[in-house]
Swiss-Prot record:
Biased composition (Acidic residues): 38-76
Biased composition (Basic and acidic residues): 13-37
Top-level taxon in the UniProt lineage: Eukaryota
Keywords tagged on the record: Acetylation, Immunity, Phosphoprotein
One GO location term (cellular component): nucleus
TM ranges: none
Annotated segments matching region Disordered: 1-102
Protein name: Parathymosin
Annotated function: Parathymosin may mediate immune function by blocking the effect of prothymosin alpha which confers resistance to certain opportunistic infections.
Residues with PTM N6-acetyllysine: K4, K15, K92
Organism: Bos taurus (Bovine)
Residues annotated with Phosphoserine modification: S2, S5, S13
Length: 102
C-alpha cells in the first residue's frame, strides 16, 4: 500500500506541477502583453512629442533661412539687369564718365 500512495502522490504532484506551470505561463503571457501595451503607449506619446517639437522648430528655422536665400538670389540678377539698362539708356553719360567727350 505504501507503494500505491507514493505513486498517487507522484501523479498528483505531476498534475499539480503541470497546472501550476500552465498558470505561470498564462500569467507571464499576460504580463508581457501588458508591458507591450504600456511600452507602445509610452513610445507613441514620446514620438508624438518629439515629432511636434522637431517639426515645429525645424520648419520655422528652415523656412526663414530659405526665404532669406531666395530674396538674395532674386535681388542679384535684378541689380545686374538694372545696371545694364542704365548703361544702354545713357550712352552719353557713359562716354563722359570714361573720359570721352559727350
Amino acid at each position: 500500500m505504501s507503494e500505491k500512495s507514493v505513486e498517487a502522490a507522484a501523479e498528483l504532484s505531476a498534475k499539480d506541477l503541470k497546472e501550476k506551470k500552465e498558470k505561470v505561463e498564462e500569467k507571464a503571457g499576460r504580463k508581457e502583453r501588458k508591458k507591450e501595451v504600456v511600452e507602445e503607449e509610452e513610445n507613441g506619446a514620446e514620438e508624438e512629442e518629439e515629432e511636434t517639437a522637431e517639426d515645429g522648430e525645424e520648419e520655422d528655422d528652415g523656412d526663414e533661412e530659405d526665404e532669406e536665400e531666395e530674396e538674395e538670389e532674386d535681388e542679384g540678377p535684378a541689380l545686374v539687369r538694372a545696371a545694364e539698362e542704365e548703361d544702354e539708356a545713357d550712352p552719353k553719360r557713359q562716354k563722359t564718365e570714361n573720359g570721352a567727350s559727350a
